[in-house]
């Protein structure tokens, strides 16, 4: 027994060392690397000077017309105030369109704030290029000598219709070049996050002209929050037959641009955890998508497309329609846009992960219960009950097998006495006993293994869906997508200091650890010392692991463990087997070391 106790302490020591090593060798260096990269980007942005390419012509190293690349020397208000603009005002958005380039570079999300504090600033999505957080989208054209000057980054559009963009009042912009080609742009917006940009091109020149449309989403910085491998942030799109494209920022920083190939149908953009900016090009014209990074002047990331040329005969007109999505990745809204505008796989804008076939239905289930009860925490609890009911037949079979194992416990003890130190003989005899009694020795692990896909699916739902952002539960849990804010290190706020982040253990992670420990003690202790040690210390390791996970996930895990304990107890009683939870606990804490010989 003293040897077993020593093994227990070795196991817990190793577990803590692993957590410390993970923090020291991986998390801390990664955060430092991100910090240094952000500082370098900030320094590069603050360098004075601009680079200029001619309107309608490709800048060096670019396939699209370039514009001025200004230094990040102005405040947001200064940058917005120096240019002519048309206001945007919808139930979900506020901002303006810059008439120079018809650029969407001023956009805020009315319904979302930076923190749970209702007085905190609303989320800013787009900002002008002259600011440190420059982020914008624009639509333009690539022409030739025959077309003359075509709309590009430096084109000054004239506001020819409407004075404010609202869901009920579109605006019209116009531009006529020296060749007699008139571009009339009508911009409309719905009550959420979708803009329609429809260009009418009238050719009053003497000859036919050919020109290609382009669109780009440009960002002068990466998100300041550390990236998480379970979630994709960066370039995203669907390139026709080439399918879903997910390209990280680092994938293009030191490499060539990523170009999936010519496509018909699809979309492209840049996505964050909760927000996105995308362009849906004309779906009936082939186009090329590109994801790239430019280090000239100020480093910037760009997701763009260029369509095949469209020819407009003399005296004729052509129409080019683009869609721009800019806003929150709300699941019902994104799904509705996919259906309404026939955008292929637009729901993939939300990173549902490998278990898409589980994750999205689970969200829909939780969303249904949320609308019914008005609390996502309660929705998680009820969804867990539904999942338990779905898996009940299989769980019933597994728990019944475990109950049968308890019945043969006396026979197992006899085999231990019979074979003594003959471990090989004992294992063979045990396997024969399992076969005769039709027992699966791994039945105790199966309930945990079964829920792993569901666990990851729920983790995805809680982590990536904006509906969980700032969603309260009860008491101190005001954001189910964030970790439990309490910590045992300072006695849950009673002491005026904070311990190391990797040692933070909130109330809910501790509750989860206790329920997991009790669930493990519902099962017979494995005869193998290594397995027994694993069963003993697994709850401790999981408690530390889940301490930094979203509170909603930890609540789910604790509640699921509680339901599993009740389910297993009921099944064992039905099988006529004594529930030995309290006996196992009493035995665990009353064991005494053997006296030294």
Curated annotation (Swiss-Prot):
Renumbered residue ranges of the record's region Disordered: 38-75
Cell location: Cell inner membrane
Family: Belongs to the OXA1/ALB3/YidC family. Type 1 subfamily.
Record's protein name: Membrane protein insertase YidC
Assembly behavior: Interacts with the Sec translocase complex via SecD. Specifically interacts with transmembrane segments of nascent integral membrane proteins during membrane integration.
Naturally occurring in which organism (per UniProt): Sinorhizobium medicae (strain WSM419)
TM spans (from-to): 8-28, 372-392, 446-466, 491-511, 535-555
GO cellular component entries: plasma membrane
Keyword set, alphabetical order: Cell inner membrane, Cell membrane, Chaperone, Membrane, Protein transport, Transmembrane, Transmembrane helix, Transport
Bilayer disposition of the protein: Multi-pass membrane protein
A GO biological-process term: protein transport
Source domain of life: Bacteria
Function (record text): Required for the insertion and/or proper folding and/or complex formation of integral membrane proteins into the membrane. Involved in integration of membrane proteins that insert both dependently and independently of the Sec translocase complex, as well as at least some lipoproteins. Aids folding of multispanning membrane proteins.
Main location: membrane
